[in-house]
């Protein structure tokens, strides 16, 4: 049985540089090949016409260029509605599956992408953590989610493409920092075709303090969102087990340093859960926590998940909570839920699908 060749896309830039050197080629070839893969999206080495035939043959002898398989596609609402949420289930090289979501609106096309297969953090209100953790995604597996969504957009909106990216899919992005960073650098590279400004990219974390510090020093110009969900240490630990390792006091100090360093506000994401974090006292604690650094608050509703007993709050409770924050002079928004009917909303991604797999040409 013939051994399957390695997927060249899985190599980091440093690993690709070393592979090219091992072939006896000059370093500048690395950039050329990388551009063919991630800017021109070459499917074969034969397409790389600016590279010698000899090198193309060498590459073809050692590597292949692989793509994720579209295993399922679900749309929230009518297939003819250009603004309905879409969820893609992608099958990776090792047969693991991830989900990525397109959230269209009149002014933007947002890609919600995953950073890991599953999630190790097991947040109590999130389906991704209940599936278990398999592995980190490579940089190309992150990038290919964006490209897959872009391909889908072109079947519905000929002149549109992804305008924003949020790392709010499966996994904790800051636990996969190197691959996260490389994927962002590729997607924002001004010499590549996609070329999305980093300010259009948001990284969401539950508050991994070493990762926040690393992000602050990385030179990336992305936005940062913190999945806070409670400003009570006890309540937060009951919802987010890893919060026991990173106290709210530590997190507040880290975010104060981060915003001072970057000059940019962070977004505090707060999912309202009936009877758990929705009281006047909870609102007071949230206001107190947010006064220490530059931030805005984004409230979201709970999206139902099978086998979880949480419930969304009543509108009256939500209005009271919002008013308390506004009275304190703090900017607050309420995020509209997208894709709940296809389990594509916040906290619902669990890499489940039903449709037969097909190749990328059918995206």
Curated annotation (Swiss-Prot):
<keyword id="KW-0411">Iron-sulfur</keyword>
<dbReference type="InterPro" id="IPR007197">
    <property type="entry name" value="rSAM"/>
</dbReference>
<feature type="active site" description="S-methylcysteine intermediate">
    <location>
        <position position="346"/>
    </location>
</feature>
<dbReference type="GO" id="GO:0070475">
    <property type="term" value="P:rRNA base methylation"/>
</dbReference>
<dbReference type="GO" id="GO:0051539">
    <property type="term" value="F:4 iron, 4 sulfur cluster binding"/>
</dbReference>
<comment type="similarity">
    <text>Belongs to the radical SAM superfamily. RlmN family.</text>
</comment>
<feature type="binding site">
    <location>
        <position position="204"/>
    </location>
    <ligand>
        <name>S-adenosyl-L-methionine</name>
    </ligand>
</feature>
<dbReference type="GO" id="GO:0070040">
    <property type="term" value="F:rRNA (adenine(2503)-C2-)-methyltransferase activity"/>
</dbReference>
<keyword id="KW-0819">tRNA processing</keyword>
<dbReference type="InterPro" id="IPR027492">
    <property type="entry name" value="RNA_MTrfase_RlmN"/>
</dbReference>
<dbReference type="InterPro" id="IPR040072">
    <property type="entry name" value="Methyltransferase_A"/>
</dbReference>
<dbReference type="GO" id="GO:0019843">
    <property type="term" value="F:rRNA binding"/>
</dbReference>
<dbReference type="InterPro" id="IPR004383">
    <property type="entry name" value="rRNA_lsu_MTrfase_RlmN/Cfr"/>
</dbReference>
<keyword id="KW-0408">Iron</keyword>
<feature type="binding site">
    <location>
        <begin position="171"/>
        <end position="172"/>
    </location>
    <ligand>
        <name>S-adenosyl-L-methionine</name>
    </ligand>
</feature>
<dbReference type="Pfam" id="PF04055">
    <property type="entry name" value="Radical_SAM"/>
</dbReference>
<feature type="binding site">
    <location>
        <position position="119"/>
    </location>
    <ligand>
        <name>[4Fe-4S] cluster</name>
    </ligand>
</feature>
<keyword id="KW-0698">rRNA processing</keyword>
<protein>
    <recommendedName>
        <fullName>Probable dual-specificity RNA methyltransferase RlmN</fullName>
        <ecNumber>2.1.1.192</ecNumber>
    </recommendedName>
</protein>
<keyword id="KW-0489">Methyltransferase</keyword>
<dbReference type="InterPro" id="IPR013785">
    <property type="entry name" value="Aldolase_TIM"/>
</dbReference>
<dbReference type="GO" id="GO:0000049">
    <property type="term" value="F:tRNA binding"/>
</dbReference>
<feature type="binding site">
    <location>
        <position position="126"/>
    </location>
    <ligand>
        <name>[4Fe-4S] cluster</name>
    </ligand>
</feature>
<keyword id="KW-0479">Metal-binding</keyword>
<feature type="disulfide bond" description="(transient)">
    <location>
        <begin position="112"/>
        <end position="346"/>
    </location>
</feature>
<feature type="binding site">
    <location>
        <begin position="227"/>
        <end position="229"/>
    </location>
    <ligand>
        <name>S-adenosyl-L-methionine</name>
    </ligand>
</feature>
<feature type="domain" description="Radical SAM core">
    <location>
        <begin position="105"/>
        <end position="341"/>
    </location>
</feature>
<dbReference type="GO" id="GO:0005737">
    <property type="term" value="C:cytoplasm"/>
</dbReference>
<keyword id="KW-0949">S-adenosyl-L-methionine</keyword>
<feature type="active site" description="Proton acceptor">
    <location>
        <position position="99"/>
    </location>
</feature>
<feature type="binding site">
    <location>
        <position position="303"/>
    </location>
    <ligand>
        <name>S-adenosyl-L-methionine</name>
    </ligand>
</feature>
<keyword id="KW-1015">Disulfide bond</keyword>
<keyword id="KW-0808">Transferase</keyword>
<feature type="binding site">
    <location>
        <position position="123"/>
    </location>
    <ligand>
        <name>[4Fe-4S] cluster</name>
    </ligand>
</feature>
<keyword id="KW-0963">Cytoplasm</keyword>
<comment type="function">
    <text>Specifically methylates position 2 of adenine 2503 in 23S rRNA and position 2 of adenine 37 in tRNAs.</text>
</comment>
<dbReference type="GO" id="GO:0002935">
    <property type="term" value="F:tRNA (adenine(37)-C2)-methyltransferase activity"/>
</dbReference>
<dbReference type="GO" id="GO:0030488">
    <property type="term" value="P:tRNA methylation"/>
</dbReference>
<keyword id="KW-0004">4Fe-4S</keyword>
<dbReference type="Pfam" id="PF21016">
    <property type="entry name" value="RlmN_N"/>
</dbReference>
<dbReference type="GO" id="GO:0046872">
    <property type="term" value="F:metal ion binding"/>
</dbReference>
<dbReference type="InterPro" id="IPR048641">
    <property type="entry name" value="RlmN_N"/>
</dbReference>
């Amino acid at each position: 049985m013939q051994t399957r060749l390695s997927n060249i896309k899985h190599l980091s830039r440093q690993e690709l540089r070393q592979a090219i050197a091992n072939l006896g080629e000059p370093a500048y070839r690395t950039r050329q090949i990388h551009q063919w893969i991630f800017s021109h999206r070459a499917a074969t080495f034969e397409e790389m016409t600016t590279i010698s035939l000899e090198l193309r043959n060498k590459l073809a002898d050692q590597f292949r260029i692989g793509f994720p398989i579209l295993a399922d596609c679900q749309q929230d609402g009518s297939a003819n509605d250009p603004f309905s949420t879409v969820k893609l289930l992608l099958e990776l090289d090792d047969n693991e599956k991830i989900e990525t979501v397109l959230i269209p609106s009149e002014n933007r096309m947002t890609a919600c992408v995953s950073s890991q297969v599953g999630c190790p953090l097991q947040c109590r209100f999130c389906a991704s953590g209940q599936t278990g953790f398999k592995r980190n995604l490579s940089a190309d597996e992150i990038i290919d989610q964006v490209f897959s969504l872009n391909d889908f957009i072109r079947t519905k909106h000929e002149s549109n493409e992804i305008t924003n990216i949020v790392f709010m899919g499966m996994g904790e992005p800051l636990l996969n920092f190197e691959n996260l960073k490389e994927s962002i650098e590729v997607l924002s590279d001004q010499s590549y075709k996609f070329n999305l400004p980093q300010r259009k990219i948001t990284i969401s974390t539950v508050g991994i303090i070493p990762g926040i510090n690393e992000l602050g020093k990385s030179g990336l110009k992305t936005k940062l969102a913190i999945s806070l969900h409670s400003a009570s240490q006890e309540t937060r630990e009951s919802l987010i087990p890893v919060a026991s390792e990173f106290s709210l006091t530590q997190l507040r100090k880290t975010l104060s340093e981060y915003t001072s360093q970057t000059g940019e506000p962070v977004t505090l994401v707060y999912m309202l859960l009936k009877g758990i974090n929705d009281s006047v006292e909870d609102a007071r604690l949230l206001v107190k926590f947010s006064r220490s650094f530059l931030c805005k608050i984004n409230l979201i509703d709970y999206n139902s998940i099978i086998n979880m007993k949480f419930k969304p709050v009543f509108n009256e409770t939500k209005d009271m909570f919002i008013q308390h924050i506004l009275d304190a002079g703090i900017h607050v928004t309420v995020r509209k839920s997208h894709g709940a009917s296809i389990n594509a909303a916040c906290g619902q991604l669990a890499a489940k699908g039903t449709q037969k797999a097909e190749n990328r040409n059918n995206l």
